């Protein structure tokens, strides 16, 4: 598994970047700062420092780790080339055949190309965050330049935190949705209690370490309907998605000892949450028709929403919209129906790419209100590969969705 930097280390790097930005500014201008004495704050020392030195100096890829971090962040791979479709393929199993000298010698001329199963993933999504800093707030509401700088940096960090929370919720919902709808029935095992679930988790971990074609979903890929693909998972690559309650129980079982004997920290291999729900998926096209819904969606940051907008089926919200008039009976929460839930999978099945370099774009100054608006753009791609092992253990009935 990938190494994870601590929040303290990341915070130190951000502080060092802020210090370096200040040193660069002082070297270019002077150490004697003012808020300016012009009619507006445009191009004054403070605005120049924040927009031209502080924000550009901070490495967004580092900042993405700090405060309200995304627990799946260590899986993300930075990728500069974005917007393309991603394709994954595997070579299907073949069986050696006996030498039969009675067969027609012309068989040697028959082609025998390797059969492949392929999975084409859609391109990722470019998302944006928007925030505005009012220079009059800076001028009148802060006693010192340090206070104003901390405020500006705090707003920036909060927007990055909001990105992290959204990414984490979407990734968790994707894993839960996949486990409940995409696995073969043979890979869903029933448990009747915590003790029974722990026993079946231990068995599943042993199963995934065997050469087997049982525990992947190659049949979900193009060309994989006929035939099989044998896989095996190393212990260090096996992770469990579950609840905090079950994680605390599993930490006291022989499963934890198995990882410990192998020199692996079991706590890093159990990704747990207090609640596996909280994400809602639209089940039919919805037309936004009420002022209440517009105000609600805008309050959560979707400032583009207007009456008459159509929200297509399959859209995902990371906050509860089920009480809005248009959404009632038209959304479902992506959540296991039972607290007995453990999804065991090979970590390589999670495909997570992003592009966070240069996220902060050139700001726009509005002279009427003496304020600066910033945009943060980032690219995110998340998918689950059918070519790696997975087993779900729960007590609810699970019916795989047909494609």
From Swiss-Prot:
Q: What is its main location?
A: virion
Please indicate which superkingdom the organism of origin belongs to: Viruses
Record-given protein name:
Major capsid protein
Tell me which UniProt keywords the record has, alphabetically. Capsid protein, Virion
State a GO cellular component annotated for this protein: viral capsid
Q: What is the role of the protein in this entry?
A: Assembles to form an icosahedral capsid.
> Where does the record say this protein resides?
Virion
